[in-house]
Regions:
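Short, surface-exposed ligand-recognition loops at beta-strand->loop->(often short) alpha-helix junctions
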Residues: 15-19
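C-terminal catalytic core of tyrosine-transesterase DNA break-rejoin enzymes
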Residues: 121
């Protein structure tokens, strides 16, 4: 059953950061995310919604004692956040120019040209473009 509100996908990752405000600035400046929403959530912590492209929604917020970030737990993130983009080569160059920790571009057997990027708190992002 599909019942998201207008403008939302059925699934949207919600990432936790030790410094959510800094993470928003980093994701906007490094990868071109646009902030769609910023509003106070529980206990005064901000809730953010970022878009990449027309429908690439990711939500993020401030970590807390109850909801901890991978960084605060000292673990490698258990998930990768995967986005399809229209020009992966251009995004790769933009991310490198911003000083991001990125892998080299590669083409997968499935036909995705892609790279991985690790953000300032260790979340891992995969940006890809279908090329074949």
């Amino acid at each position: 059953m599909r019942n998201p509100p207008p403008g939302y996908n059925t699934v949207a990752p919600y990432l936790l950061y030790e410094d959510a405000e800094r993470a928003v600035e980093y994701l906007q400046g490094t990868f071109g995310f646009e902030e769609r929403l910023a509003q106070p959530g529980a206990a005064g912590r901000m809730h953010h919604e970022l878009l990449l492209g027309d429908d690439g929604l990711v939500m993020l917020g401030q970590a807390s004692e109850s909801f901890r970030s991978p960084r605060s737990l000292g673990i490698y993130p258990p998930v990768l956040i995967h986005f399809y983009v229209s020009n992966v080569d251009e995004l790769h160059e933009r991310a490198k120019a911003a000083g991001a920790d990125v892998t080299d571009l590669e083409t997968s057997p499935a036909g995705d040209r892609r790279f991985n990027a690790t953000d300032l708190e260790g979340q891992v992002w995969v940006f890809a473009q279908r090329v074949s």
